[in-house]
Amino acid sequence: MNLAGFVPLSLCDYPGRVAAVVFTQGCNFRCPWCHNGHLLPMASDPATRVDEARVMAVLSERCTRLGGVVVTGGEPTLQADLPRFLKRLKTLGLDVKLDTNGSHPDVLRRLLQERLVDYVAMDMKAPWDKYATLTGVACDVAAMQASLRLIVTSGVSHAFRTTRVDPLLSAQDYARLADQVPEGSLHTWQLFRPAYSQDPALRAAAALAGASQPHAPA
């Protein structure tokens, strides 16, 4: 596995669980608001690459005190070794939460069929017709829709996540986006953090919008 980060203890990334977090290198999207820009290239920096053996050693030592492991990115489903890695986690008795953009339903289907994931969080970037604009690449929207259906019908715990980027999406866009999430599925909204954006223009627009907000008198 091409790993680029490891957090041995997190209280906020796996709902209801004390978990470790593993970050994979590489993403096929170029969302301008991404706060993990260093994880976008498929090729990792040898100086910062995380050794899988070291990660497994730490998890083996702590597995009885952890409720699970979050595998995030980047985009984990780009990793050819992902099924093998998840099997290693499962042999430790650890539940697995997968964070994904949903672009590879074939991989997701295999992971679900082999019961290698216990929780799936899929990003919902935009209304379907705006996906290419918001992700910065040509998108196979049908693939994301297939992943959504797989997740909802799988029976595993799941959530859909949206980052509110007001300079890029309108209130009408958010309403249409919310309608894409099947009834009964959890849909969480995350705040855009402009300081970490990959797009200088987006950072500037967010700063300008913040400056124009009314402030209480001192």
List each language-model region with its residue ranges.
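Non-heme iron-sulfur electron-transfer modules
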Residues: 41-56
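Conserved AdoMet/S-adenosylmethionine-binding subsite of the radical SAM
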Residues: 56-68, 77-204
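A structural motif corresponding to the C-terminal lobe/cap of the Radical SAM core domain
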Residues: 205-209
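Hydrophobic packing within well-folded, soluble alpha/beta domains
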Residues: 27, 31-34, 89, 98
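N-terminal [4Fe-4S]-dependent radical SAM core
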Residues: 1-23, 32-44, 61-65
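Conserved strand-to-loop "acid loop" that flanks and positions the catalytic carboxylate
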Residues: 74
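Terminal, non-globular segments
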Residues: 214-218
